[in-house]
């Protein structure tokens, strides 16, 4: 007896809808943008970075999580698009069992979790750079590595917990959908991601303001003042990243909460008409390397411009000191 289960008519209708096809094509754009900008972001992080070595470890971990999500998401998106365009006239479109999708889903969810936890890890490392005295290279490297490993471990633990005791006896069209018995936990996960993104945003603002407030309490010695300026620049970059991440996660979790709460009073077609556009993690993943690349390049260009002004302008000693002070603002 065949154990194959075929897609229902409603699922096939969703696959062949113009809304679905447009969404699947558009969502591949941020996926490929992520791959391209990750390459350039890693290059500028290595060569022109405003970040310490410990922060670089965490940035690499964030790049890894973002690209892990995008690779797995792209595979399933292309597969669904292929089915939508070329296989819907077949007598049976076989569904996958939840059990055979288990490992794929766990790795996929760990990519999403890694993007959120990675931001928290970056802030924790920035807090260490701010409040720990003598935060020199060896100490910062150990801190960065410890936080990176912890983030990766927590990411995979989270994905396992979501489907911990799920019987996985159902069927689904794609391996990036949560099993039917784990839907409630997936909703909790979405809410936690949003709250954690909000926490990251508030924390990053507080750390940035603290460093800005005490910037000039550091004696005007090039080494200490430069490190203080480095902390301010890197923290403001992370602050901007967390703001973008929070907005996307708010749309993701709040949007799904609303449509799930009214699912009983709207049709299957209308539910998925909206749902396909509410999944924002591909855009979160794409924004990360883009913003890192932009912020590092703009900071580097600003420093070069200031140096050129120093070297090309004749000044008195007092004017030179004042200009140097302004450069650190």
UniProtKB/Swiss-Prot annotation:
Any Pfam family matching the protein: 7TM_GPCR_Sra
Keyword Transmembrane recorded: yes
Gene Ontology biological process terms in this record: detection of chemical stimulus involved in sensory perception
Transmembrane segments: 25-45, 103-123, 144-164, 188-208, 238-258, 273-293
Annotated GO CC locations: membrane
Primary site of residence: membrane
GO MF, any single term: G protein-coupled receptor activity
Domain of life: Eukaryota
Localization per record: Membrane
Membrane topology: Multi-pass membrane protein
Family statement drawn from the similarity comment of this UniProt entry: Belongs to the nematode receptor-like protein sra family.
Protein name: Serpentine receptor class alpha-4
Source organism of the structure: Caenorhabditis elegans
């Amino acid at each position: 007896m065949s154990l194959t289960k075929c897609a229902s008519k409603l699922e096939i209708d969703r696959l062949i809808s113009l809304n679905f096809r447009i969404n699947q094509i558009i969502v591949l754009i941020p996926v490929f943008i992520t791959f391209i900008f990750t390459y350039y972001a890693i290059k500028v992080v290595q060569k022109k970075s405003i970040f310490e070595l410990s922060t670089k470890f965490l940035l690499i971990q964030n790049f890894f999580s973002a690209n892990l999500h995008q690779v797995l998401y792209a595979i399933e998106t292309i597969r669904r698009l292929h089915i939508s365009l070329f296989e819907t006239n077949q007598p049976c479109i076989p569904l996958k069992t939840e059990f055979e999708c288990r490992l794929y889903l766990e790795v996929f969810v760990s990519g999403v979790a890694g993007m959120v936890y990675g931001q928290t890890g970056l802030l924790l490392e920035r807090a260490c750079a701010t409040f720990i005295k003598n935060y020199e290279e060896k100490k910062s490297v150990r801190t960065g590595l410890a936080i990176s490993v912890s983030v990766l471990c927590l990411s995979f633990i989270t994905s396992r917990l979501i489907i911990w005791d799920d019987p996985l006896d159902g069927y689904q069209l794609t391996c990036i959908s949560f099993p039917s018995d784990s839907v409630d936990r997936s909703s909790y996960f979405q809410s936690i991601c949003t709250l954690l993104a909000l926490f990251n945003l508030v924390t990053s603002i507080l750390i940035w303001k603290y460093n800005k407030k005490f910037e000039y309490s550091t004696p005007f010695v090039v080494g200490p003042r430069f490190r203080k300026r480095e902390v301010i620049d890197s923290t403001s970059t992370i602050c901007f990243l967390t703001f973008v991440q929070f907005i996307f996660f708010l749309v993701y979790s709040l949007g799904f909460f609303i449509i799930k709460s009214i699912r009983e009073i709207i049709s299957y077609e209308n539910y998925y008409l909206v749902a396909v556009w509410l999944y924002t993690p591909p855009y979160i993943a794409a924004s990360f390397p883009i913003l890192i690349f932009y912020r590092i390049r703009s900071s580097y260009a600003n420093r070069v411009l200031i140096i050129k002004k120093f070297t090309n302008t004749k000044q008195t000693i007092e004017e030179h000191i004042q200009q140097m002070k302004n450069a650190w603002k």
